[in-house]
């Protein structure tokens, strides 16, 4: 038990502590930036200064600091996060490390993401579940390519709150002029980001603890909040609840003949008992009869809650269907444009079929065309015949069936999908819907999916056979 928990238990008692803890809001955030900007040290400082470290953890850090630490005689707080042996020996972050802590105001889940360019896919994975990005900048180096890269990816993945932490201010003598230079440079770059992004910029020293949990005595010229105060105050719940109601069905719950409900987690918006709803893609409508949870029925539920909905009418709804409010504007299409982050050595090439999973729905998709690849160091675009490992580009997709979806910026759960290799079952990429295109009408055919894949395989490996492209025949 850490000292913060002990203090709260002494003040509130066990029942009071558990009740308070249960009703705290949750913020998921990631730390990112260039290599050796101090991301892991910052998280270690947050945990240490908010008294979230157990005594045995602190003892282990003191011991390991003498062997692989980089802070001399002081404990290397980065070791609280860098758990892999390779990370500790190299002094870098490779995998996405998740840490949990809480204060009296809020609960937090931190994703510590790698800074190296070759681990961009790991960083994208960490960002996909977060609400806010803490982007670190070394005060000595300023805004680097990797800073721009991670800002772009965080923005692409729909994060609307950025905290830019100018770290290592102790190494530039806590210079206000240097901080203002970096602030101006980053704000100029941020004008190229999509949508409206809330950006706050603060000077910190993760090593010394300045402006992390406590205000700095060395930077009296900074009058803003500390990093922890920003994290405790940012409101992400209202944004999710303000969106249109989206409920991807994960499971049809039928424990007996008298009960049939549809289980899942509300992606956005609010639903109430008595609301008129429509199930997609069938288009059938009904009314919400009950909102069932483990703790009892609710009159209304909002984004983030896992619930089971029962309806007044018996309509056909299956796993992967989407329940929305009646009359909601939802795209139903098999043709779309999506930004893709590619995560495997074998490049993404047009014409190949992949398994697609989107909001509980599984289908088959194909890249028809790569419109462009992003140079995510300067946000420029260039033409590309394929997407390499860690490449990000805008691709045109067709699916085997029409699917109800949203733009990713509007709702990540119903606008994001994963791409799976059909032979190895490995997740090879992530897609974010940017635009729904005119639906492609496919002619009826006697060709099965297996025959189409076999045809593609033959044309690839035995071109001298001059086999015709069956998929092209279907378009005629």
UniProtKB/Swiss-Prot annotation:
Its EC number is 2.7.7.4. Residues 33-40 are annotated as: G1. InterPro entries: CysN_GTP-bd, CysN_II, CysN_NoDQ_III, EFTu-like_2, G_TR_CS, GTP-eEF1A_C, P-loop_NTPase, Small_GTP-bd. It holds the Pfam family GTP-eEF1A_C. Residues 205-207 are annotated as: G5. It catalyses: sulfate + ATP + H(+) = adenosine 5'-phosphosulfate + diphosphate. Keywords: ATP-binding, GTP-binding, Nucleotide-binding, Nucleotidyltransferase, Transferase. Disulfide bonds: none annotated. GO terms for biological process: hydrogen sulfide biosynthetic process; sulfate assimilation. Residues 112-115 are annotated as: G3. It is an enzyme of class 2 (transferase). Residues 24-243 form the tr-type G domain. Residues 167-170 are annotated as: G4. Pathway: Sulfur metabolism; hydrogen sulfide biosynthesis; sulfite from sulfate: step 1/3. Residues 91-95 are annotated as: G2. Heterodimer composed of CysD, the smaller subunit, and CysN. This is Sulfate adenylyltransferase subunit 1. It comes from Vibrio vulnificus (strain YJ016). The gene is cysN.
């Amino acid at each position: 038990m850490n000292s913060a928990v002990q203090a709260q238990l002494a003040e509130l008692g066990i029942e009071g502590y558990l009740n308070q803890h249960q009703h705290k809001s949750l913020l998921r955030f990631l730390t990112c930036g260039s290599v050796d900007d101090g991301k892991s040290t910052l998280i270690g400082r947050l945990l240490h200064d908010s008294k979230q470290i157990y005594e045995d953890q602190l003892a282990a850090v003191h011991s390991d600091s003498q062997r692989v630490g980089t802070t001399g005689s002081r404990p290397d707080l980065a070791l609280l996060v860098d758990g892999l042996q390779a990370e500790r020996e190299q002094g870098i972050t490779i995998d996405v490390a998740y840490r949990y802590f809480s204060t009296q105001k809020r609960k937090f889940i931190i994703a510590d993401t790698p800074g190296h360019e070759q681990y961009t896919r790991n960083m994208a994975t960490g960002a996909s579940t977060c609400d806010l990005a803490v982007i670190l900048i070394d005060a000595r180096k300023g805004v680097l390519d990797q800073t721009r890269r991670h800002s772009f990816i965080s923005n692409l993945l729909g994060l609307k709150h950025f905290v830019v932490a100018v770290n290592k201010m102790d190494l530039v003598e806590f210079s206000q002029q240097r901080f203002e230079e970096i602030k101006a440079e980053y704000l100029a770059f941020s004008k190229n980001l999509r949508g409206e992004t809330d950006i706050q910029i603060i000077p910190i020293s993760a090593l010394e603890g300045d402006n992390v949990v406590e205000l700095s005595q060395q930077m009296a010229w900074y009058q803003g909040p500390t990093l922890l105060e920003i994290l405790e105050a940012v409101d992400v719940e209202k944004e999710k609840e303000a969106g249109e109601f989206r409920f991807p069905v994960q499971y049809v719950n039928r424990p007996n003949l008298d009960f049939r409900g549809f289980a899942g987690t509300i992606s956005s918006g609010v639903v109430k008992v008595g609301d008129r709803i429509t199930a997609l893609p069938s288009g059938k409508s009904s009314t919400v009869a009950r909102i069932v949870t483990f703790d009892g029925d609710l009159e209304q539920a909002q984004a983030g809650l896992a619930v089971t909905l029962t309806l007044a009418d018996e309509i056909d709804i299956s796993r992967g269907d989407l329940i929305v409010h009646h009359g909601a504007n939802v795209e139903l299409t098999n043709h779309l444009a999506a930004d893709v982050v590619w995560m495997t050595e074998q490049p993404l090439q047009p014409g190949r079929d992949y398994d697609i999973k989107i909001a509980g729905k599984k289908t088959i998709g194909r890249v028809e065309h790569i419109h462009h690849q992003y140079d995510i160091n300067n946000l420029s675009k260039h033409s590309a015949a394929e997407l390499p490992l860690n490449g990000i580009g805008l691709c045109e997709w067709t699916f085997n069936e029409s699917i109800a979806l949203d733009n990713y910026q509007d709702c990540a759960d119903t606008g994001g999908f994963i791409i799976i290799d059909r032979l190895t079952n490995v997740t090879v990429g992530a897609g974010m819907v940017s635009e729904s295109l005119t639906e492609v009408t496919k002619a009826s055919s006697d060709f099965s999916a297996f025959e189409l894949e076999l045809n593609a395989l033959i044309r690839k490996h035995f071109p001298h056979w001059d086999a015709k492209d069956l998929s092209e025949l279907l378009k005629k």
